[in-house]
Amino acid sequence: MSILNNKEVIVIIDAWSGGKHLIPAFQALGYFCLHVQSTFLPEVFIADNQLAIARSDRHIVHDGNIETLLSQLQPYTIKAILAGSEGAVGLADCLNDALELTFSNQFELSAARRNKYLMQEQLALKGVASINQQLAGHSDELKQWLAGHAHWPVVLKPIQSAGTDGVFICHDLAQALQAFEAILAKKDFFGSPNREVLCQEFLAGEEFVVNGIACQGEYFFTELWQSKKQQRNGFPVYETQYLHYQNDAGFDVLTAYTVQVCQTLGINNGAFHAEVMMTSGGPVLIEIGARVAGGADPYIIEECLGHSQISKLAQAVLHPAKFLQECRRQHDFSGHRRAAYVYMISPSPGRVQVSPEEKFIKIDGVISINYHYAPGDIQQETCDLLSSPGVIIAIRDNPALLKQTIAEIRDVEADFYHLGLIDE
């Protein structure tokens, strides 16, 4: 028996990482979901892409020809086109512009939302706090900027990438030149060659992730995360992220600044995921993505705050009037539950003897473990976010209990590295 309908369609491009939750979220509300796979599929997202193929009502593999893709979309009445991960942002902008969809961002600023150099230049142009930087395609350009900048450390990274891929913190000229050559010698996370390197001042302070949803130029902040990192061999490595919200210190300053950033970069509709450093002089953007947060589990925020980036994005797309009404309403989140992402940090490579999940899940407050290896695999040394062997998520009723849970997680992790791995 066949079923015919004229339902509006939600198009999701690269429903990977945090975006993998978008297809079931819209389908649960009765919407037909069409998934577009862009031209490059990073190896780390192969499993997520297979999940998107299985879940979606139709799957299209984009061959790089926009006109062909538009013709494939032509039979559908499209409600919205959404980027499911960072590499999809540019394609989503192109399709939204071609189809003149209203739930979209300012097309003229599309490049500034993806290119980290142009992003900071646009902020500086509009007088919004930004990073001192230089684009270098040759080592002489790097040396010239470093001589003029005259402050250490500095940050070198690709112009377009994801996570902490290819991000170096350099403390002297030798380290900077080595990082420069290392970045140029490899492709970025999305398979494009690095032909120039972004050189930036190092921001000292407390780092925050600021997540939210835009709708018709108004903004709802779903959650903030305070990020604790450590440096390993010149690389920034995530250690722990702590949930913050409206009643926590710094919320108003961080969100007011992020509104400025979104407005300056033309983020008027859809999800955004910003990394902001709270410096002694105030908040400064590290970078922002016009998409849902990568790797995020909406359960955590729903459990602690009663909403998530996924649920609020669906509301903004489907019921904008209700979304805007809730943006303007005062909410009391005092006493909200506390949560943390605890990232495993592997000190050295080793062959996995036994997986650690069962020991982690027994700790009070641990709700999930995402461990990336199986017995017999070689667990890699952690040098960035993508090489962390796993993440443990914890929820407790107050900060003291959460601190206790995190300490127990680190104890179990240390035992695992000592007893569960064989040196390679």
Curated annotation (Swiss-Prot):
It is an enzyme of class 6 (ligase). The keyword Protease does not apply. PROSITE patterns: ATP_GRASP. InterPro entries: ATP-dep_AA_Ligase, ATP-grasp, Dapdiamide_Synthase. Binds 1 magnesium or manganese ion per subunit. GO terms for biological process: antibiotic biosynthetic process. Pfam families: ATP-grasp_4. Residues 120-318 form the ATP-grasp domain. It catalyses: 3-[[[(2R,3R)-3-carboxyoxiran-2-yl]carbonyl]amino]-L-alanine + L-valine + ATP = dapdiamide E + ADP + phosphate + H(+); N(3)-fumaramoyl-(S)-2,3-diaminopropanoate + L-valine + ATP = dapdiamide A + ADP + phosphate + H(+); N(3)-fumaramoyl-(S)-2,3-diaminopropanoate + L-isoleucine + ATP = dapdiamide B + ADP + phosphate + H(+); N(3)-fumaramoyl-(S)-2,3-diaminopropanoate + L-leucine + ATP = dapdiamide C + ADP + phosphate + H(+). Mg(2+) binds at E275, E287. Disulfide bonds: none annotated. Its EC number is 6.3.2.47. Keywords: Antibiotic biosynthesis, ATP-binding, Ligase, Magnesium, Manganese, Metal-binding, Nucleotide-binding. It comes from the Bacteria. Pathway: Antibiotic biosynthesis. ATP binds at residues 147-209. One of its GO terms (molecular function) is ATP binding. Its cofactor is Mg(2+); Mn(2+). Involved in dapdiamide antibiotics biosynthesis. Ligates N-beta-fumaramoyl-DAP and valine, isoleucine or leucine to form dapdiamides A, B or C, respectively. Also ligates N-beta-epoxysuccinamoyl-DAP and valine to form dapdiamide E. This is Dapdiamide A synthase. It comes from Enterobacter agglomerans.
